[in-house]
Amino acid sequence: AIKHGADVIVSGAGLPLDLPELVKMGMKLRKELFEEAPQKIYNKCKEFVTKIAPIVSSAKSASVILRLWDRNYKSTADMVVIEGPLAGGHLGFSNNDLHRLGADTKIVSKTYLKEIFDKEIEDIIKVVSEYENKYEKKIPVIVAGGIYNKNDVSHAFKLGAAGVQVGTRFVTTHECDAPLAYKEAYINAKEEEIRITVSPAGLPGRAIENEFLRRLDKGNIPVRKCYDCLSKCNRVDIPYCITDALISAARGDVDNALLFCGANA
C-alpha cells in the first residue's frame, strides 16, 4: 500500500509496534518504483510520507504503542482511532471488558454504561496529547463504534475527539458495494438479533444473528479447507473458518455468512 502511494495506513490488528519501520521500508520501495517516472511525479512521490494511525481501545494500548514508537523509531502517530465496544466485527476487548461495560447484551441501548468508556476516551486523548507536545504537532483523535446520529457525533466532540468514524450506517447505501442480501440483513435486523459471538481470531465480535450463528451455537462448523490466514489456527479445534464465513458474506450467501455489524445496525 505504501509502495503504491497510500495516504494513510490505519492499523488495528493487535498492537502495530513496528509500523513506523514498515513505513520506512515501504517508502524505499516507492522511490524505486517511481525512479523512471517524470521528474515532477518522482519528486512528489519521493517526498510524500504515508501517514500512520493505530486503532486502540484503551489508554493502556495507546500508551504502549506511542511509547515504543517514540523510543524505538523517534516518531509518533499522525492520527489515532479509538474503536469503542459498540463497534461491529472483531473488538479489541475481552469478554469480561464487554460485560463490565454492559456491551455484551442484545439490548445495549439499555445496558451500555457509556460514562465508563467516555472516561477511557478522555484518558486516551490525554495520552495522545503528551506526544502532541513532544513532537509539536496535532494528532487528531477519531472516535468509532456505535456512532449513529448527530447526538453521538456531538458527544464525541464534547469529549475532545477531532472526528468520528462511521461504518454500519453506510453499509445499506447505494454507494456501498456489499451485496443486496447483506444490506437487507442490516435493514431487517432488530436490536435483539445483534449479538456478541466467538471468532477463530481469538477475539469477541459483533454480528447479526442468522442461520450460521444458530448452527455455531450447536457446535463447531467443520473446516473444509485451510487458507493459512491465521498464524495460530488449528483447523481441528477452531469453531469455524473465518475466511469462508467472510467470503460468504461478500457473496451475499447470508445463511452461511458471518454478518458483522455495529450495535446500532
Where are these regions (language model features)?
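Active-site entrance/lid segments in N-terminal catalytic domains of soluble metabolic enzymes
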Residues: 1-134
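Gly/Ser/Thr-rich loops at beta-strand to alpha-helix junctions
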Residues: 15-16, 147-149
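Residues that cap or flank secondary-structure elements
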Residues: 11, 144-145
